[in-house]
Amino acid sequence: MASSNGLSLQEIADLVGGQLLDFSDCINDETNSSDGAVQGKSPSVEISSTICTGAAPPAEAGPQQITLIDQANHAGQLADSQAFAVIAPEYVAASPIRLQILVDDPHAAFTKLVSHYRPALGETMPVSGIDPTAKVDPTCQVHPSANIGANVEIGPGCTIAPGVNIGAGCQIGADCTLHPNVTLYAYCQLGERVTLHAGTVVGAHGFGYKMVDGRHIPTAQLGYVVIENDVEVGASSTIDRGTYGATRIGEGTKIDNQVMIAHNCQIGRHNLLCSQVGIAGSCTTGDYVVLAGQVGLKDHIALADGVIVGAQAGVMDDLAPNQVYLGSPATPQRDQMQIMAVQRKLPEMRRELKRLTQRIGRLSEALEEQSADIDQRKAA
């Protein structure tokens, strides 16, 4: 997400209390100092003065933006990133990005930087009415009780129903319908022909906490939500904003009532998510995925294209393409049907096991008695 609040690389380093170094000469050298440590150099004035237009996660950062890596062994995340600089806790040798700002706490530094580029995030809801800086197409129908925040842009043909709240910086494409009491937090983006049913909340704070002195302290949730064209979201569903970048709902996806999608999730195109589905943070789904009612997904897993997951399944691992999965933990349909067939026989199997155990007990007693008789005869 680009910003007009551009900073030079040196200004960013000063803002976050880091050291800006250029490691371009270290690409082919594991070390370049007498003590074996890799030594970057201070970049030229020209490079230090380069303006950075925004901050985003590696996969989202553009060529004039800066990104983040919290551990050197996560360098693979930077392989396809377009960012021209990275904030890191130490020199990242495997990084293709050679301009690095080294800091003690990358997340704290990145939080400060993202807050600079998106300062209105805390001003999520307008006080009342339509902010004078908002741009609402004259063909829109906006109920008088709706609230529209600063710098919001709403395209032609949209319908904004009673009680809708649209936070600062949101962008809404043509022919969208927001039913009563829908809430969009700051910087959310809707494509064209998006329908959000009553009570839906888009862009709320992600469920992220860290333990500090025995207390759960909220972590920064400074991202936003992108909902692409022709998406429909049912009543009272919730889609949390990303930590730094976007939680994304792909084109044509249909989401039922009371569905929960957590921060950083990337939902593919033309998915069907049925009622009470719960998707934990940083999950990815491919295209044409179907999740039946009350399916739950563990965080940081990926479902490939064409996956179908049956009702009430619990998904704990990545799922292969074009397969049907059932049960908890979710397993391929054929395997789960065999498990279910055995489960139905468990009461009968338990009774049979009890009978066999009793029979073995009687046989064991008889053998012991027979053995004792043989011993007595031998003794006589």
From Swiss-Prot:
Enzyme's top EC category = transferase
UniProt-listed Enzyme Commission number(s): 2.3.1.191
Pathway(s): Bacterial outer membrane biogenesis; LPS lipid A biosynthesis
Q: Does the keyword Methyltransferase apply?
A: no
Check the record and name the Pfam families matching this protein: Hexapep, LpxD
Cellular component per GO?
membrane
What is this enzyme's catalytic activity, as reactions?
Answer: a UDP-3-O-[(3R)-3-hydroxyacyl]-alpha-D-glucosamine + a (3R)-hydroxyacyl-[ACP] = a UDP-2-N,3-O-bis[(3R)-3-hydroxyacyl]-alpha-D-glucosamine + holo-[ACP] + H(+)
Q: Name one GO biological process term.
A: lipid A biosynthetic process
Q: Which NCBIfam families match?
A: lipid_A_lpxD, PRK00892.1
Q: How does it assemble?
A: Homotrimer.
Family designation: Belongs to the transferase hexapeptide repeat family. LpxD subfamily.
Tell me the protein's name.
UDP-3-O-acylglucosamine N-acyltransferase
